[in-house]
Amino acid sequence: LRRHHVVLTVNPDGCQLGLRANARGIDLNRNFPAANWKAGETVYRWNSAAEERDVVLLTGEEPGSEPETQALCQLIHQIHPAWVVSFHDPLACIEDPGHSELGQWLAGAFNLPLVGSVGYETPGSFGSWCADIGLPCITAEFPPVSADEATEKYLAAMTDLLHWHTHR
């Protein structure tokens, strides 16, 4: 029996407000209790094409301090997934440090380049935390397009992902 768990958003406040940070101004993707977590300010890249593209936010009072981060960590420990695909934007790539079979499939299905790194440090990120606990995590970074265009371009591939299985 194959089972999939889909978390629609880890940041409901940010989705509602159109922001990366939660309601407390914390960048949740720098708040995970990863070994590389850093206190203080963090930078995120909001647009890979713009000249002024880095925005400064906070990482939280301590690793895993935010309820949203805690909830996702608890879920991961509860369900013990074999792998995770985390969807983001706007860097237009599939980030898979291990260049796994799934990462290669995603790159083809989404017609995005497969990269080993997004090109800048991501301390306290979900991917860093997953690496610390030995959970394969691939980050699918969509390009900066509207929700309608993303649905048109990627919905079929996202549905196909639910049926993906290794060929080994």
Question: Which functions belong to the PLM regions below?
Answer:
Residues I94-D96, G103, T122-R168:
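Active-site-adjacent mobile loop/cap segments within catalytic or ligand-binding domains
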